[in-house]
């Protein structure tokens, strides 16, 4: 099921920055936010508790990638934090992903990273030594993720149709690299607009700078939300 709220990436370095940003929104506006490595490593689990305490939903984007036992234990901790969604690297393998699912339990959604949106096909060939197309690599990871019993994947919106065709329409596709029409590309090479992502079948979209660095973050969020919901 498509999430009607665009996820806001809280890419801030401090707790105070997060508090200041979220304070701009009225209490009745319940957001879905992404907490990534920078913020989580700077502040720790308390940032998740704080955001959840405000009534917002949390996608904890830590991209775990380790041996199955370690990932399982870490997921048990994240489950106790009350996260709504978290992720692992699909490259960790099916057994690692199964262990992650077991550790997290059945409540939160668990998705896997396929290829980062900053990765070009040339980089994948030269550095990862994967000699298929980028799209084929992503679909392969998605099929293995489904095999492991996870809910979906993080992927570029460009791969959504192929992924759902290879798995199922219920398989979740969360797409970063979303930018409102006319905005700067930044460091992500494969981008789409919210309207494009909706049309192509994305279930979740993630935006950071177009909202967090906007002159009026609330207006920017509402405009993107309206575009996402058509």
From Swiss-Prot:
Quote the record's binding site residues for substrate. 11, 34, 61-70, 117, 179, 188, 208-209
Q: State which Enzyme Commission number(s) the record gives.
A: 4.1.1.23
Query: Pathway, per Swiss-Prot/TrEMBL?
Result: Pyrimidine metabolism; UMP biosynthesis via de novo pathway; UMP from orotate: step 2/2
SUPFAM superfamilies referenced in this protein's UniProt entry, alphabetically = Ribulose-phoshate binding barrel
Q: Which UniProt keywords apply?
A: Decarboxylase, Lyase, Pyrimidine biosynthesis
Q: Where is the active site?
A: 63 (proton donor)
**CDD domains in UniProt:** OMP_decarboxylase_like (cd04725)
InterPro entries per the UniProt record, alphabetical = Aldolase_TIM, OMPdecase, OMPdecase_AS, OMPdecase_bac, OMPdeCOase_dom, RibuloseP-bd_barrel
Q: Name one Pfam family in it.
A: OMPdecase
What NCBIfam families does the record point to? PRK00230.1 (NF001273), pyrF (TIGR01740)
HAMAP family noted in UniProt: OMPdecase_type1_B
Task: State whether it acts alone or in a complex, and with which partners, per the record.
Answer: Homodimer.
Protein name per its UniProtKB record = Orotidine 5'-phosphate decarboxylase
């Amino acid at each position: 099921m498509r999430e009607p709220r665009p996820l806001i990436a809280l890419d801030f370095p401090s707790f105070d920055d997060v508090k200041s940003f979220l304070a701009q929104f009225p209490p009745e506006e319940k957001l879905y936010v992404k907490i990534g490595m920078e913020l989580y490593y700077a502040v720790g689990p308390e940032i998740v508790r704080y955001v959840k305490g405000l009534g917002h939903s949390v996608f904890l984007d830590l991209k775990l990638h380790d041996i199955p036992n370690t990932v399982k234990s870490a997921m048990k901790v994240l489950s106790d934090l009350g996260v709504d969604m978290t992720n692992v690297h699909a490259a960790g393998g099916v057994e690692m992903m199964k262990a992650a699912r077991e550790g997290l339990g059945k409540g939160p959604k668990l998705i896997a990273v396929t290829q980062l949106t900053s990765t070009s096909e040339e980089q994948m060939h030269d550095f990862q030594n994967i000699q298929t197309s980028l799209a084929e690599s992503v679909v392969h990871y998605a099929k293995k993720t489904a095999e492991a019993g996870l809910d979906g994947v993080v992927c570029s919106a460009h791969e959504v149709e192929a992924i759902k065709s290879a798995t199922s329409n219920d398989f979740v596709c969360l797409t970063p690299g979303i930018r409102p029409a006319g905005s700067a590309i930044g460091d992500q090479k494969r981008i789409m607009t919210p309207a494009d992502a909706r049309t192509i079948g994305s279930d979740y979209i993630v935006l950071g700078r177009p909202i967090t660095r906007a002159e009026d973050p609330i207006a920017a969020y509402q405009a993107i939300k309206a575009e996402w919901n058509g």
